[in-house]
Amino acid sequence: MTNKARLRFAPSPTGQIHIGNIRTALFNWLYSRHIDGEFILRVEDTDMNRSVEEYEQIIFRALSWLGLDWDEGPQKGGDFGPYRQSERKDIYHKYANKLLEAGKAYYCYCTEEELEEMREAQRARGEMPRYSGKCADLSSEERAELENEGRKSVIRFKVPENQTIRVNDLVKGEVDFESDGIGDFILIKSDDMASYNFACVVDDYLMNITHVLRGEDHLSNTPKQVMIYEALGFETPEFGHLSLILGPDKAKLSKRHGDTFIGEYREKGYLPEAMVNFLALLGWSPPGEDELFTQDELIRLFDIGRVSKSAAVFDVDKLNWMNSHYIKEADTERLLNLSKEYLINSDLVSQEQLEHDWEWFVSAVDLVKEKIDMLSELPPQLKIFYGDDVDLKGEEVEFLEKDHVPELLSEVINQFNDLDSFEDPKAIKKAVNKAGKQVGVKGKQLFMPVRIAVSGQMHGPELDQLISLLGRERAINRVNSTLSQIQS
């Protein structure tokens, strides 16, 4: 083993990447950076029928989007490659042969039908289904006969009897497993590829992995892996199993709770810094009461000893609050760049118009960004700047029925026409105040009618900035439209 801590994230490219997997990647990445270790990415594509290169690329993009850079792995290389299990078949066979030669593994020729009959018989006897060891002591003649029948073989690990396997888990503490409850399991499958448990052990050893942090759904694999480590004479890494992520109803997080794939959050316009902050707090608690952390702060604070044994609850309201905070704090030009697709797909603006009026759009987004939880909500907020007519409804109409409103709005139009420039919000504010002075109103009786007249809403962005961005012509047209409606 190396003196430097080495952690890995080893996803399978068999589908979209789940929030739980990304949380696992994040914890491994944070801990490796916290202890000045190395973070390795390994693709576990031993399931040749389900592994798809497109999903591999999705994994790479998700990690890169979140800023989880890897020191070794696909696209980057390293001294311990290759980093795809499908490219390491010969390595697995080398170690499987060592176990065969040592009498710690054997060839099994049982068909799926025979295995199912075995399981049914065990269930009928009230036993836990597991492999019976039927092929464990086949002679070379018996093996040859089965092979002549055209049977395909697998290689099974010979599980030691009456053995307690103790795992000192970094999160769960001491966990004991009894070998008698574990049947002889497969090391090399009939397609000649290593099983998950075997490939995982060989790779973790050869890649000098010192810490294995993964979801608690892998806890049941751990005794099998520990037995393989011991059978091969390998040093065992430290294991830590992370609690499940639950939905608000305390059931395991699934599609019925909403989005569960990281790509869906990116598509909706969540910022990577918000996702990292939020996911870091799913099962880990920093010291103190703060909940908002930069990536550097998370690296400095992350301690495996503060990872909870209890399941974490995915609270989308908290995520939305966190994302809205990061949107407010973000550079507005960056937000606009990230929002181009939403704006163009909403038919609010063309690519050409967006490029031509870029500075105007930056100002408009800056004005409304505090109203949104995610960037996909931006187009409806920007609609306030479009159109010359105002659609008045109940409460707004009632407020405009006050006697002073027609005179006030007429004076506002006069003041707008008298302005030398419409680009200075301060000048617009003075013009509105001047109109109020002429009519003899101030405060709510002044600003609310003007706001409703230019936006159709009783609440919204800073009034003077809103009017400035509307421009003189559109602002005056809207006030005239409002006057026409209340005077008709």
Curated annotation (Swiss-Prot):
Superkingdom of origin organism: Bacteria
Localization, per the record, is: Cytoplasm
Q: Where does Zn(2+) bind?
A: C108, C110, C135, D137
Principal subcellular localisation of the protein: cytoplasm
Q: Which InterPro entries match?
A: aa-tRNA-synth_I_cd-bd (IPR045462), aa-tRNA-synth_I_codon-bd_sub2 (IPR020751), aa-tRNA-synth_I_CS (IPR001412), aa_tRNA-synth_I_cd-bd_sf (IPR008925), Glu-tRNA-ligase_bac/mito (IPR004527), Glu/Gln-tRNA-synth (IPR000924), Glu/Gln-tRNA-synth_Ib_cat-dom (IPR020058), GluQ/Sye (IPR049940)
The family database entries (Pfam families) matched by this protein are listed as: Anticodon_2, tRNA-synt_1c
Q: What is this protein called?
A: Glutamate--tRNA ligase
Protein keywords: Aminoacyl-tRNA synthetase, ATP-binding, Cytoplasm, Ligase, Metal-binding, Nucleotide-binding, Protein biosynthesis, Zinc
Listed GO cellular component terms? cytosol
Q: Where is the motif 'HIGH' region annotated in this sequence?
A: 11-21
GO terms for MF: ATP binding; glutamate-tRNA ligase activity; tRNA binding; zinc ion binding
Q: How does it assemble?
A: Monomer.
Reactions catalysed: tRNA(Glu) + L-glutamate + ATP = L-glutamyl-tRNA(Glu) + AMP + diphosphate
CDD domains in alphabetical order? GluRS_core
**Which cofactors does the annotated protein need, by name?**
Zn(2+)
PANTHER family recorded for this chain?
A: GLUTAMATE--TRNA LIGASE (PTHR43311), GLUTAMATE--TRNA LIGASE, MITOCHONDRIAL-RELATED (PTHR43311:SF2)
Q: Which GO terms describe its biological process?
A: glutamyl-tRNA aminoacylation
Details of cofactor binding: Binds 1 zinc ion per subunit.
> Does the keyword section mention Lipid metabolism?
no
The record's comment on protein family reads:
Belongs to the class-I aminoacyl-tRNA synthetase family. Glutamate--tRNA ligase type 1 subfamily.
Q: Where is this motif: 'KMSKS' region?
A: 252-256
Briefly state the protein's biological role. Answer: Catalyzes the attachment of glutamate to tRNA(Glu) in a two-step reaction: glutamate is first activated by ATP to form Glu-AMP and then transferred to the acceptor end of tRNA(Glu).
Instruction: Give residues annotated as binding ATP.
Output: K255
Class of this enzyme: ligase
Q: Which EC number applies?
A: 6.1.1.17
NCBIfam families for the chain: gltX_bact
